Regions:
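Helical segment within the ABC ATPase nucleotide-binding domain
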Residues: 109-122
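ABC-family P-loop ATPase nucleotide-binding domains
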Residues: 26-82
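Conserved ABC transporter NBD signature motif
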Residues: 1-13, 17-18, 155
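Catalytic Walker B motif of ABC-type/P-loop ATPase nucleotide-binding domains
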Residues: 95-99, 104
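H-loop/switch region of ABC-family ATPase nucleotide-binding domains
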Residues: 130-131
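A short, surface-exposed alpha-helical micro-motif characterized by mixed small hydrophobic
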Residues: 136-138
Protein backbone atom coordinates (compact mmCIF):
# COMPACT_ATOMS: atom_id res chain seq x y z
CA UNK A 1 0.00 0.00 0.00
CA UNK A 2 1.13 3.51 -0.67
CA UNK A 3 3.12 5.35 -3.26
CA UNK A 4 6.77 5.56 -4.19
CA UNK A 5 7.89 9.12 -4.96
CA UNK A 6 11.40 9.57 -6.35
CA UNK A 7 12.71 13.11 -6.83
CA UNK A 8 9.12 14.33 -6.99
CA UNK A 9 8.08 11.70 -9.56
CA UNK A 10 5.44 9.07 -8.77
CA UNK A 11 6.92 5.70 -9.73
CA UNK A 12 3.53 4.36 -10.81
CA UNK A 13 2.33 7.32 -12.91
CA UNK A 14 5.64 8.91 -14.00
CA UNK A 15 7.71 5.76 -14.44
CA UNK A 16 9.84 6.90 -17.39
CA UNK A 17 10.89 10.13 -15.66
CA UNK A 18 11.55 8.38 -12.35
CA UNK A 19 13.63 5.56 -13.83
CA UNK A 20 16.14 8.08 -15.21
CA UNK A 21 16.94 9.04 -11.62
CA UNK A 22 17.21 5.55 -10.13
CA UNK A 23 19.75 2.78 -10.67
CA UNK A 24 19.12 -0.80 -9.57
CA UNK A 25 21.81 -3.37 -8.79
CA UNK A 26 20.38 -6.88 -8.44
CA UNK A 27 21.65 -10.33 -9.35
CA UNK A 28 18.38 -10.78 -11.26
CA UNK A 29 19.18 -8.10 -13.86
CA UNK A 30 20.50 -9.21 -17.21
CA UNK A 31 22.73 -7.72 -19.85
CA UNK A 32 23.98 -8.98 -23.19
CA UNK A 33 25.96 -11.81 -21.65
CA UNK A 34 27.98 -12.58 -24.79
CA UNK A 35 29.16 -8.95 -24.95
CA UNK A 36 31.89 -7.17 -23.00
CA UNK A 37 31.19 -4.48 -20.38
CA UNK A 38 32.10 -1.78 -22.89
CA UNK A 39 29.89 -3.26 -25.60
CA UNK A 40 27.00 -3.38 -23.14
CA UNK A 41 27.64 0.26 -22.29
CA UNK A 42 27.53 1.24 -25.95
CA UNK A 43 24.35 -0.78 -26.59
CA UNK A 44 22.40 0.08 -23.44
CA UNK A 45 23.71 3.51 -22.52
CA UNK A 46 21.50 5.17 -25.15
CA UNK A 47 18.48 4.45 -22.93
CA UNK A 48 19.75 6.75 -20.17
CA UNK A 49 19.70 10.54 -20.51
CA UNK A 50 22.81 11.09 -18.39
CA UNK A 51 24.84 8.12 -19.67
CA UNK A 52 28.63 8.58 -19.71
CA UNK A 53 31.07 6.11 -21.28
CA UNK A 54 33.82 8.03 -19.48
CA UNK A 55 32.16 7.21 -16.14
CA UNK A 56 31.88 3.56 -17.20
CA UNK A 57 35.62 3.44 -17.93
CA UNK A 58 36.39 5.03 -14.55
CA UNK A 59 34.15 2.62 -12.64
CA UNK A 60 35.44 -0.43 -14.52
CA UNK A 61 38.97 0.58 -13.55
CA UNK A 62 38.05 1.34 -9.94
CA UNK A 63 36.28 -2.00 -9.49
CA UNK A 64 38.97 -3.90 -11.44
CA UNK A 65 36.54 -5.28 -14.01
CA UNK A 66 38.05 -6.67 -17.23
CA UNK A 67 36.84 -4.48 -20.09
CA UNK A 68 37.34 -7.01 -22.89
CA UNK A 69 35.90 -10.16 -21.32
CA UNK A 70 32.34 -11.33 -22.15
CA UNK A 71 30.07 -10.95 -19.14
CA UNK A 72 29.04 -14.63 -19.14
CA UNK A 73 32.60 -15.43 -18.01
CA UNK A 74 32.27 -13.27 -14.87
CA UNK A 75 31.94 -14.76 -11.40
CA UNK A 76 28.84 -13.79 -9.42
CA UNK A 77 30.83 -11.19 -7.49
CA UNK A 78 32.35 -9.73 -10.67
CA UNK A 79 28.87 -9.56 -12.22
CA UNK A 80 27.57 -7.58 -9.23
CA UNK A 81 30.57 -5.24 -9.47
CA UNK A 82 29.82 -4.72 -13.16
CA UNK A 83 26.22 -3.84 -12.37
CA UNK A 84 27.42 -1.21 -9.91
CA UNK A 85 29.79 0.23 -12.53
CA UNK A 86 27.00 0.31 -15.11
CA UNK A 87 24.54 1.88 -12.67
CA UNK A 88 26.95 4.64 -11.68
CA UNK A 89 27.66 5.38 -15.35
CA UNK A 90 24.25 6.91 -15.84
CA UNK A 91 24.75 9.16 -12.84
CA UNK A 92 21.61 8.35 -10.83
CA UNK A 93 20.22 10.38 -7.96
CA UNK A 94 19.28 7.17 -6.12
CA UNK A 95 20.93 3.77 -6.05
CA UNK A 96 18.87 0.69 -5.08
CA UNK A 97 21.05 -2.24 -4.07
CA UNK A 98 19.38 -5.65 -3.78
CA UNK A 99 21.75 -7.99 -1.90
CA UNK A 100 24.72 -6.22 -3.52
CA UNK A 101 27.48 -8.12 -1.72
CA UNK A 102 26.25 -11.54 -2.83
CA UNK A 103 29.25 -13.32 -4.26
CA UNK A 104 31.86 -10.80 -3.07
CA UNK A 105 35.00 -12.15 -1.49
CA UNK A 106 35.72 -10.90 2.07
CA UNK A 107 38.45 -8.52 0.89
CA UNK A 108 36.21 -6.74 -1.61
CA UNK A 109 33.30 -6.70 0.83
CA UNK A 110 35.45 -4.40 3.00
CA UNK A 111 36.30 -2.20 -0.01
CA UNK A 112 32.61 -2.07 -0.89
CA UNK A 113 31.86 -0.17 2.32
CA UNK A 114 34.25 2.58 1.22
CA UNK A 115 32.76 2.65 -2.28
CA UNK A 116 29.24 3.09 -0.91
CA UNK A 117 30.48 5.87 1.36
CA UNK A 118 32.04 7.61 -1.67
CA UNK A 119 28.72 7.29 -3.52
CA UNK A 120 26.86 8.79 -0.57
CA UNK A 121 29.43 11.62 -0.45
CA UNK A 122 28.32 12.49 -4.01
CA UNK A 123 24.87 13.06 -2.50
CA UNK A 124 23.40 9.99 -4.17
CA UNK A 125 20.74 8.34 -2.03
CA UNK A 126 21.41 4.66 -1.36
CA UNK A 127 18.76 2.09 -0.41
CA UNK A 128 20.19 -1.35 0.25
CA UNK A 129 18.48 -4.62 1.09
CA UNK A 130 20.73 -7.20 2.67
CA UNK A 131 20.72 -10.06 5.13
CA UNK A 132 24.40 -9.49 5.94
CA UNK A 133 24.12 -7.22 8.96
CA UNK A 134 27.80 -6.25 8.93
CA UNK A 135 27.16 -4.60 5.54
CA UNK A 136 24.71 -2.10 6.99
CA UNK A 137 26.26 -1.76 10.43
CA UNK A 138 29.16 0.19 8.97
CA UNK A 139 27.44 2.38 6.36
CA UNK A 140 23.75 2.82 7.17
CA UNK A 141 22.53 6.07 8.65
CA UNK A 142 18.88 5.02 8.57
CA UNK A 143 17.60 1.48 9.03
CA UNK A 144 14.23 0.00 8.14
CA UNK A 145 13.16 -3.57 8.72
CA UNK A 146 10.49 -4.84 6.37
CA UNK A 147 9.15 -8.28 7.19
CA UNK A 148 6.87 -9.87 4.58
CA UNK A 149 5.88 -6.44 3.25
CA UNK A 150 5.20 -4.97 6.70
CA UNK A 151 7.37 -2.19 8.14
CA UNK A 152 8.55 -3.47 11.54
CA UNK A 153 10.79 -0.55 12.47
CA UNK A 154 12.34 2.52 10.94
CA UNK A 155 15.05 4.36 12.87
CA UNK A 156 18.19 6.37 12.50
CA UNK A 157 21.37 4.53 13.38
CA UNK A 158 21.83 6.82 16.38
CA UNK A 159 18.31 6.10 17.67
CA UNK A 160 19.19 2.42 17.99
CA UNK A 161 21.47 3.38 20.86
CA UNK A 162 23.16 0.34 22.39
CA UNK A 163 20.87 -2.10 20.58
CA UNK A 164 22.49 -3.94 17.71
CA UNK A 165 20.72 -4.18 14.39
CA UNK A 166 20.89 -7.97 14.69
CA UNK A 167 19.12 -7.81 18.04
CA UNK A 168 16.21 -5.82 16.61
CA UNK A 169 15.92 -8.09 13.59
CA UNK A 170 15.74 -11.19 15.75
CA UNK A 171 13.03 -9.60 17.91
CA UNK A 172 10.92 -9.11 14.78
CA UNK A 173 11.33 -12.70 13.49
CA UNK A 174 12.45 -11.29 10.12
CA UNK A 175 11.75 -12.92 6.74
CA UNK A 176 13.89 -11.85 3.79
CA UNK A 177 12.32 -9.18 1.51
CA UNK A 178 14.29 -7.82 -1.44
CA UNK A 179 14.07 -4.45 -3.19
CA UNK A 180 12.63 -6.27 -6.20
CA UNK A 181 9.85 -7.70 -3.97
CA UNK A 182 9.00 -4.18 -2.77
CA UNK A 183 8.88 -2.77 -6.31
CA UNK A 184 6.51 -5.56 -7.45
CA UNK A 185 3.90 -4.83 -4.78
CA UNK A 186 0.91 -2.77 -5.87
Amino acid sequence: QGEVIIAGKNLRTEYEEAKQKVALVSEKLSYFMDKTPLENGELLGVYFERWSMEELYLWLDRLEIPKGQPIYQFSKGMYMKYQLAFAMSYQPEFLLLDEPTAGFDPVFRKDFTGIIQDIRDREIGVLMSTHIISDIDQIADYIMLIDDGELKFSKTREALGNHSIQELIEQCGHKKTTVRDLLRRE
